[in-house]
UniProtKB/Swiss-Prot annotation:
Pfam families attached to this UniProt entry: IL8 (PF00048)
Organism: Canis lupus familiaris
Leader sequence segment: 1-23
Protein name as it appears in the record: C-C motif chemokine 4
Classification of source organism: Eukaryota, Metazoa, Chordata, Craniata, Vertebrata
Function: Monokine with inflammatory and chemokinetic properties.
Gene3D superfamilies: 2.40.50.40
Example GO molecular function: CCR chemokine receptor binding
GO biological process: antimicrobial humoral immune response mediated by antimicrobial peptide; chemokine-mediated signaling pathway; eosinophil chemotaxis; inflammatory response; positive regulation of cell migration
Keyword Cell membrane: no
Major localization listed first in the record, in broad terms: secreted
Subunit structure: Homodimer. Interacts with CCR5.
Amino acid sequence: MKLCVTVLSLLVLVAAFCSPALSAPMGSDPPTACCFSYTLRKIPRNFVADYFETSSLCSQPAVVFQTRRGRQVCANPSEPWVQEYMDDLELN
């Protein structure tokens, strides 16, 4: 009886650790960052160090600006100031 309880407990632990790894289909990478809202204010340009665009798997497109202090700020890619910052960062 003790052996059955031990084996069953071990199987439950193995299943608990393996199921998240197996839940996504092979070859599908979940998006690393998605934005669900945009900043309402224009960020000062001198605060921005870098940017990246969110994955097409996200529910809405966004540009994520990385500030010099390491914060990430989501912005609407259709805003003119966002496009301007992206162009400027590409040139530098």
